[in-house]
From Swiss-Prot:
InterPro entries: LMBD1_LysCbl_Transport, LMBR1-like_membr_prot. Its main location: membrane. It comes from Ajellomyces capsulatus (strain NAm1 / WU24). One of its GO terms (cellular component) is vacuolar membrane. This is Probable lysosomal cobalamin transporter. GO terms for molecular function: cobalamin binding.
Length: 590
């Protein structure tokens, strides 16, 4: 029975893994620029996103496996759950976590930077005449990646030798649970330090982008920007075009049709009016094409379905808003609980030994975890909400260095370099999200799940306690349980042990990670208040630039062709028409 149950849990995880591959692929193909598509960049981005999401979504498997050793109704271990069997379960989970965490670190610090420089090393002319070989390109990318290799080696060496927290300095850490967290293995300590540093860096990115996206995501679904074909914009465009033409006539009348006779100021004004008129006519044409019935039955059906399901879009936005508010409240309650009731405060990174304030998200997950995979479905949805919020935050804020925008994440217009940097940012955010969900959003669920213990002395030494008819004595597991039988019954999840080990051995990381949650809550509230009172507008300048570039590439011949291009972005298959090279004079790059 135990083998069958654990096998089914891993099968569910495998199904989720393949779904993650699909989600990552769709995300990459939707956002990348078709004319600059690169096989290597696409593969690395999809693989990296899948690996990092698989790391976070291992948590429900962790909870389900350790919880399967106990009966939450009776508060005791099941007959088959000997300590050897429990150790086998936790060991298999530890191997999976260390593999995924190490893979995430290698992808973030080595593979993605190498792919970035590999793409930058591409020279179309040299590649066509044969002067740029695979070896030269590889060596050129490797030279720049050496700095990241040295950074990774230094990071692990520092973690190998850096001093850790000692129990003699922390009088509140005499419990067996906390003693076990003090790492003595140098290899494990190096990985703990490296991931602790990456999580702390990720927390900073998480606070800036995910908090912004969590506030923007539901509001942008409820209040979307008007389309180019909306009556108001069309009327405004027609009015501006009419005024433009009238002003051109006035200026041409003054010069008798010869612009050289105009003063330099009015000549510049006439040139500006001509360019503006060209842009306004393009907008008019695109608006007419958008309103005109298409010959494609698929496109017409899509427009009709969009109109029919528009109320559902509003309802989904309201549902996301309710979920975002619930998550915000849950994070606030747990953060207050940690600040007030942590047994060791800043000495251990505000580890919370027991949940003292009711957390609605935590309550839902603890009770739903009694019926696997209900909690897994809810957890996948929660992670995707955070993931989409991070994407929205990056797309809105842009990839910046200080206040300078370096790259922009936009659907169908994201360069390979921007995709790779976005992937690194999402990797750091997801590592931070692993901490935030486990320690702040749902701490009891992520630590013990639905596990309980019978707080009643056993009838005979060596036996398990029996709470038959004594249901009030069946209590949730916690690190602060004084009953020695609780330590024999309750098994903490592997991920909670690992994260608590980081904050206990390196308290600085725990302090930064904890107080950053308040900045997350404050920034998301500020962005939400600003967004809710702000009317979304069409970015006309960006629209004109995109339309002009697409017009030059011959991609706006008809509405049907534009729909086909969008479908190609999603499926990743090129059309049968001749390929048009990108702005740099190249097609698909390897």
């Amino acid at each position: 029975m135990a083998l069958l149950q654990s096998s089914l849990i891993w099968v569910v995880y495998a199904i989720v893994f393949f779904l993650l591959v699909a989600v990552s692929s769709i995300f990459i193909y939707i956002y990348q620029t078709p004319s600059e598509r690169s096989t290597y960049v696409t593969t690395v981005c999809i693989f990296t996103l899948t690996a990092l999401l698989a790391t976070v979504l291992l948590l429900p498997v962790d909870v389900a496996l350790v919880s399967s050793t106990t009966s939450s109704r009776e508060g005791r271990r099941k007959s088959w759950a000997t300590q050897d069997e429990v150790d086998k379960i936790t060991f298999s989970l530890a191997v999976a976590y260390y593999f995924l965490y190490s893979l995430d670190a290698v992808l973030c610090l080595l593979v993605v930077p190498f792919t970035y420089f590999w793409y930058e090393e591409y020279d179309e002319v040299a590649s066509e005449d044969g002067s740029q070989t695979f070896r030269k390109r590889f060596w050129g990318a490797f030279k720049y990646t050496v700095a990241f290799i040295l950074l990774t080696v230094i990071l692990f060496l520092v973690g190998f030798f850096v001093p850790i927290g000692r129990r003699k300095d922390k009088p509140n850490l005499d419990l067996d649970y906390f003693r076990r967290l003090l790492t003595e293995n140098h290899g494990e300590r190096a990985l703990t330090f490296a991931l602790g540093l990456l999580i702390t860096i990720g927390i900073l990115v998480y606070v800036l982008y995910t908090s912004t996206g969590l506030a923007l995501l539901p509001v942008t679904i409820i209040k979307s920007a008007p389309a180019i074909s909306s009556p108001t914009l069309s009327a405004n465009t027609a009015s501006r075009l009419e005024e433009n033409i009238e002003r051109q006539r006035q200026l041409e009348g003054r010069c008798g049709g010869n612009p050289d006779r105009l003063p330099s100021k009015q000549r510049r004004e006439l040139d500006s009016l001509v360019r503006q008129a060209r842009t306004l006519r393009r907008r008019q044409r695109l608006a007419e094409e958008a309103r005109r019935p298409s010959g494609s039955w698929l496109l017409n059906a899509w427009f009709k379905l969009s109109a029919v399901f528009r109320p559902l879009k509003l309802l989904s936005g309201l549902l996301l808003l309710a979920i975002a508010m619930l998550v915000w409240v849950s994070m606030l309650l747990t953060s207050i609980d940690k600040a007030m009731n942590s047994i060791c405060k800043q000495n251990c990174g505000y580890i919370l030994g027991k949940t003292n304030i009711l957390n609605p998200i935590n309550w839902v997950f603890v009770h739903s975890s009694k019926v696997f995979p209900v909690d897994y479905i809810l957890f996948v949805f929660l992670v995707l909400v955070f993931f989409c919020s991070s994407v929205v935050g990056i797309a809105t804020t842009g990839i910046r260095f200080l206040w300078v925008r370096i790259f922009q994440l936009r659907k169908g217009h994201t360069s390979p370099q921007a995709l790779l940097i976005t992937t690194v940012m999402l990797t750091l955010i997801t590592l931070a999200l692993n901490y935030s969900i486990s320690m702040v959003v749902a701490p009891q669920y992520a630590t013990y799940g639905p596990q309980t213990f019978c707080d009643h002395p056993p009838k005979h030494p060596g036996e398990q306690p029996d709470c038959t008819g004594l249901e009030p004595l069946i209590k949730p597991c916690s690190e602060l349980s004084e009953n020695p039988t609780a330590k024999e019954i309750c098994t903490p999840t592997v991920v909670s042990t690992f994260l608590n080990r980081i904050t206990l051995n390196f308290p600085f990381f725990g302090i930064v990670d904890f107080w950053a949650q308040f900045f997350f809550l404050g920034l998301s509230l500020l962005v939400f208040l600003v967004t809710i009172f702000r009317t979304p507008k069409l970015d006309e300048q960006q629209f004109d630039e995109d339309a002009e570039a697409a017009e030059e590439e011959g991609l706006l011949a008809s509405t049907g062709r534009r729909f086909g291009a969008t479908w190609e972005d999603i499926t990743g298959r090129a059309s049968r028409s001749p390929q048009v090279s990108g702005s740099a004079g190249r097609g698909t790059r390897e």
